[in-house]
Structures are given as C-alpha cells and as structure tokens.
C-alpha cells in the first residue's frame, strides 16, 4: 500500500482528523476578515506568508466542510480581475450556500457570482 491514500482519512487531513499544521496560518488570516468584506485566496496566502499558495488556501478551507468551526470560509473568493472576485465553488449547492452567507452579511453578489473588490475587498492593517 505504499503510495496509496488511506480512504478513511479525508483528503487534506492528517490521520488524527486534524488539518495539517501549516494550514493554521490560513485559518488565522481568514478569521480576521470582517463581516461584510471579502478576500481572495491569493490575498489570504500572501498575508499568511505563503504568497504562492492560493490553491493550498482552497484546500484548507475545503477541509473544514463537515467540521465544527468558526472560520468564515464564505468570505474567501477566487480572483477574477483587479476589479472582481467570484464564487469559485463548483458544487451548485456549495456556491448557493456561499452566496446566501455573503448576502446575509450585506455583500452584493452579481448574477455571475462576482463581487466588487473596490466595494467589498478587505484591506487589513499590517
């Protein structure tokens, strides 16, 4: 079984069911995003000190599914341009949940799932 994944351990999780310790930096950044604001995966990675790890941020947030946590995952979107970020969850149910959570916080999501970074983007104080 060398090289094979253990099917009883969810992808991205350790055998003990905890996320990899390197992901805690991403979770700390996401926890700082205020209600009604959004950040991009790349922005979270950069603020966590890992500027080329946007995809890892996505894996880390995806690993939260089905767990009890207080991380506001819905506030992290995929960058589409300098002006917009967008919901990037491919699952229609997941993207609908993310949209509803964002709209409940006052974030305007257009028909294409985009959010204005100028209006709703988070600019943290360093």
Residue locations for each model-derived region?
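Nucleic acid-binding interface residues in structured DNA/RNA-binding domains
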Residues: 2-126
